[in-house]
């Protein structure tokens, strides 16, 4: 019987790369996202390429009602979840605290923090029953702040704290909890942050080789593939040319 992985925010970037990676190891995949057409395309691609089954759930993780309805209405055969990857997240803007946009703050906190909590809480009865593995997508920005990172950093510090709390509170159920903290990864992240400004987005990765979504997916799969008695609590992963949130060695 195939194992099942649930991946939030799976229509692009790290989430999509995780779906591909786990599918290649014969997992059946539950993918969620806001773009229904993208979910359908990915479902078809993965099922045809790997001969596995894919369930798509279209919702915005900010919407608690939709999250709980979608998860509670999943077919029974999809509820035996082995791995949950809380990947949905984003950054909007890179402005000083005094110049930041309140709507951007709300979207980041509701997506990065509330969304993770809603998905985890909705799935928790199933996760407890199956002694599942929860993998939360943090960030190096959740370990160390940087200039004009303010609320994005705050949201990822919260993910780190939530992961630590989960690890303690859910230990009695045999649930593993892992937090993954990437540095610079070349995905849609910067394009979203800079609201479609490709010049600004591309400049983030100039002068060095950033991580790829596949690098992170490989790492996540490794943590999920370890024996039941082994839990990697957290991993911080950066490009070789990145030493911290703000220090890079770039060829300019």
Walk through the language-model features, giving the residues of each.
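The beta1-alpha1 cofactor-binding region of Rossmann-like NAD(H)/NADP(H)-dependent oxidoreductases
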Residues: 37, 58-69, 102
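Active-site helix of classical SDR
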Residues: 120, 155
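Conserved glycine-rich Rossmann-like NAD(P)H-binding loop of the short-chain dehydrogenase/reductase
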Residues: 27-41
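Residue(s) in the substrate-gating loop at a strand-loop-helix junction
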Residues: 139
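Conserved glycine-rich cofactor-binding loop
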Residues: 11-12
């Amino acid at each position: 019987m195939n194992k099942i992985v649930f991946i939030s925010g799976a229509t692009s970037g790290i989430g999509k790369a995780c779906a591909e990676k786990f599918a290649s190891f014969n997992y059946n995949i539950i993918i969620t996202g806001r773009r229904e057409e993208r979910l359908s395309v990915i479902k078809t691609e993965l099922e045809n390429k790997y001969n596995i089954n894919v369930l798509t759930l279209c919702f915005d993780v900010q919407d608690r009602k939709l999250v709980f309805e979608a998860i509670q209405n999943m077919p029974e055969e999809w509820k035996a979840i082995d791995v949950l990857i809380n990947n949905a997240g984003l950054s909007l803007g890179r402005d000083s605290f005094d110049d930041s946009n309140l709507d951007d703050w709300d979207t980041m906190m509701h997506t990065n923090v509330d969304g993770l909590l809603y998905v985890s809480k909705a799935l928790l009865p199933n996760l407890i029953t199956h002694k599942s593995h929860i993998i939360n997508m943090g960030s190096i920005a959740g370990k160390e702040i940087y200039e004009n990172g303010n609320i994005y950093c705050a949201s990822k510090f919260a993910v780190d704290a939530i992961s630590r709390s989960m690890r303690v509170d859910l230990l009695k159920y045999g649930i593993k909890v892992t937090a993954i903290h990437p540095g610079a990864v070349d995905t849609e992240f910067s394009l979203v942050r800079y609201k479609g400004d490709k010049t600004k987005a591309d400049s983030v990765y100039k002068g060095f080789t950033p991580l790829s979504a596949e690098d992170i997916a490989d790492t996540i799969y490794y943590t999920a593939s370890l024996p039941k008695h082994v839990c990697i609590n957290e991993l911080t992963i950066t490009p070789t040319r990145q030493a911290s949130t703000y220090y890079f060695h770039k060829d300019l």
